[in-house]
Amino acid sequence: MRSFKSLLVALIGLTSLMYALQDLASIDEMRMQVGAAPGDGYRDTLLSGSPAAGWTGFALITLCQFVIAGVAFKGAWDLYAARNATDAEYKVAKSAAIWAGGLSLLSWFALSLMVGAGLFQGGSDFGAMAMTRAFQLGSTSALTILFVNGVRD
């Protein structure tokens, strides 16, 4: 069961890493979105006309996804390395994995809901996919961490 938990946490890292790399691969689409005028699929939102704010939000979200991936991979390794340890040692090894889940939820709540939806893409077609991705990462990470922390080893 302990190895399986490590695999689940590694999947959080892999998912977050894929999202971050996809963000970088889609930089041309981001350039078009930052340059889009209200009415080009966007509502006239608080910061919709600010390219600097758009790029800052993009960089912050992408950086956060890389951080989540790194913390999740560390958590997965810690869990795997402690798979034969005592219960107390294994509980300590869960720390980074739990942080990965917490950071995923923070990414969803703070970055996607507040920055992405609240300031830029709220109510637009462009924002729907970003919100869905963030929700999927946050909710699956939370469920994984509940499993890792709550299911008996």
Predicted features along the sequence, with ranges:
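Extended, low-polarity transmembrane helix blocks
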Residues: 1-22, 55-63, 67-153
